Amino acid sequence: MESLSPGGPPGHPYQGEASTCWQLTVRVLEARNLRWADLLSEADPYVILQLSTAPGMKFKTKTLTDTSHPVWNEAFRFLIQSQVKNVLELSIYDEDSVTEDDICFKVLYDISEVLPGKLLRKTFSQSPQGEEELDVEFLMEETSDRPENLITNKVIVARELSCLDVHLDSTGSTAVVADQDKLELELVLKGSYEDTQTSFLGTASAFRFHYMAALETELSGRLRSSRSNGWNGDNSAGYLTVPLRPLTIGKEVTMDVPAPNAPGVRLQLKAEGCPEELAVHLGFNLCAEEQAFLSRRKQVVAKALKQALQLDRDLQEDEVPVVGIMATGGGARAMTSLYGHLLALQKLGLLDCVTYFSGISGSTWTMAHLYGDPEWSQRDLEGPIRYAREHLAKSKLEVFSPERLASYRRELELRAEQGHPTTFVDLWALVLESMLHGQVMDQKLSGQRAALERGQNPLPLYLSLNVKENNLETLDFKEWVEFSPYEVGFLKYGAFVPPELFGSEFFMGRLMRRIPEPRICFLEAIWSNIFSLNLLDAWYDLTSSGESWKQHIKDKTRSLEKEPLTTSGTSSRLEASWLQPGTALAQAFKGFLTGRPLHQRSPNFLQGLQLHQDYCSHKDFSTWADYQLDSMPSQLTPKEPRLCLVDAAYFINTSSPSMFRPGRRLDLILSFDYSLSAPFEALQQTELYCRARGLPFPRVEPSPQDQHQPRECHLFSDPACPEAPILLHFPLVNASFKDHSAPGVQRSPAELQGGQVDLTGATCPYTLSNMTYKEEDFERLLRLSDYNVQTSQGAILQALRTALKHRTLEARPPRAQT
């Protein structure tokens, strides 16, 4: 396990707590009325038991033949931690010697209703669908073990880790091997980070395993020959098993490997405690770096507001309204338009009034490029705009030249050597970098902190979605992942890592293997991953209407209302979660529709972490929970080895979730929408989504006239909800720009051609797939976006005054009392 650098994450807002472990005894008694798949005989049933919080532990009863009423009466023991969500999975299988064993049924049971010292007998049934029943007894007993040290934010729990150091000494071995064959020792520790490690005999070798301290597990090992690739000797020769619980921390134990043809092989074992400090920051509040940035930025914003609104006094820090830019996706169109919007804000002296700057998909290309310059908002934006125009107008044939392809290959090979899992998305990253820059850009997300040191720029927030790699479409399972120069993490779990560690390997919140931070282009490929769309998502996009999307959100809301995520002592919902297996054909078809062959894969920094006993009822978790899987800990992201990150626009074309993190509390949002049609659709979807989660969002109710002929700027608010920010929405429309070269300046006949911007025609140059613009097309789109913001100056200033008034009223009472 690697140590944190001095620049690692700050201390956790939640202190460690000691909690006792318990022994759970599960006795599988009998089953009744089992159906069988074999037409010629009854079932040959057995039961598999797994506990979501005991990784690597799987128990199996004996198989009973030809019976629909098996009686096992077998007991199994788990060591459990009561502060985590312990869900027992019981599965009855019908053994088949020819084909794969058939599953009869499966039940998930939350054991929180098992009271200490009281025997509980449960009968699990499949009614009303079937008559199958399974009788099981549960007994919870206290152990004499010392309490376990936990770190938790009440959603995620980091448990205590131990390290097992294994030294293989085979230098004195006189191994008898035929035909120069080599003997290899394989060591397995189920549930550990490493799982399996191997070494050839003949040299001294050292291994280290990281495993959960409160885990009833064992180290197993075998010798095998390299030539035959099979186990050496019979089933017992060269095989060893070492239970880890009896090992004394800090005490070395030496043992011989029982291999008749390799005498003298010894293992030296030593268990040690792992450092308690986490590399993953657990907490829903803003990190210390962002809080310090906010204090610095408010000084800049206060000065800008005083000048823009012509105030006669300086603002106090608690009076400064928080303004955010919320940019949508749209490929090169979004990139170009965003430059125009920012240019207009700079001309109006309003860019320094902005504190947060969020984006997704194509808008992140603008953001990533600008933040390569620590002083970008203080410099003339015409420079970056010329740069973007030059590269967007150039031919893209060079991007696929033999020389470039060879350079891509070398870069991908280097990434693989560094430990990054390489996918097609990484190739897309290099192609995108070549398109937008024409050269290798040695910039990283952590380097953008230089642009925040004095509060001289807004804080950039990049959004992505984590989805299931297979079997579920984006609408049914998605988790927001936020990237900032300070941290990368999940809004839903309250778990974050510094950007330097994104892509590194973690286990139970500890850094296991540090991998170099990726260059910014590889993150841009994640944020704008146009290749991650699975077939079911594509089918939905092709066949759905806006109304069906609304219905989807409403259905999800009703589902949450009918089946709340908060669990009672009876755990009735989990008890009823009978998972019926589909046919092989159905599963194959589902996999075909939902597979993501071109998704991006990143090591999961949540790997090994567990869910708190009351995670479902935590406000911050339930805010972002929206699927049945959220009540099944074994199906959530901490159980996955890798993240599957995709473009957030595949769900809603919005970057709004970042605006609702606790501690940010925006007063005014400038919404820049880059859709070519339906200028209010994404915003209305966002309102539905936010309201379903209890997030304060203004009412988005454009008039029929505005729907038919949208203006440059629309104001939305909700007087009934003071917590909801004011929202100024800027759709991508060509309204008065057709006739005006600047606000209030009518175009001359010679200038009318410059006002013709084709946004909807059959020859529109701004389609999502187009990455090459003519210079005049780039210029028209840029000037249109610039104009639309400048002509809305009055609306922006009035919204700023209203936001300032609200903040000032909130700030006055505490001062008045002093």
UniProtKB/Swiss-Prot annotation:
Q: How the protein sits in the membrane?
A: Peripheral membrane protein
GO biological process terms held by the UniProt record? fatty acid metabolic process; glycerophospholipid catabolic process; phosphatidylglycerol acyl-chain remodeling; phosphatidylinositol acyl-chain remodeling
Which part of the chain is the PLA2c domain? Answer: 273-818
Tissue pattern of expression reads: Expressed in stratified squamous epithelia, such as those in skin and cervix, but not in other tissues. Strongly expressed in the upper spinous layer of the psoriatic epidermis, expressed weakly and discontinuously in atopic dermatitis and mycosis fungoides, and not detected in the epidermis of normal skin.
Name the Enzyme Commission number(s) assigned to this protein.
3.1.1.4
List, alphabetically, the Pfam families matched. Answer: C2, cPLA2_C2, PLA2_B
The places in or outside the cell where this protein is found are: Cytoplasm, Cytosol; Membrane
**Ribonucleoprotein found in the keyword field:** no
The residues that the entry says bind Ca(2+) 2 are 38, 94, 96, 102
Binding sites annotated in the UniProt record for Ca(2+) 1: 38, 44, 94, 96
Required co-factor(s) are: Ca(2+)
InterPro entries tied to this protein:
Acyl_Trfase/lysoPLipase, C2_cPLA2, C2_dom, C2_domain_sf, cPLA2_C2, LysoPLipase_cat_dom
Its annotated function is as follows:
Calcium-dependent phospholipase A2 that selectively hydrolyzes glycerophospholipids in the sn-2 position. Has a preference for linoleic acid at the sn-2 position.
Protein's recorded name: Cytosolic phospholipase A2 delta
Task: Give the species this sequence originates from.
Answer: Homo sapiens (Human)
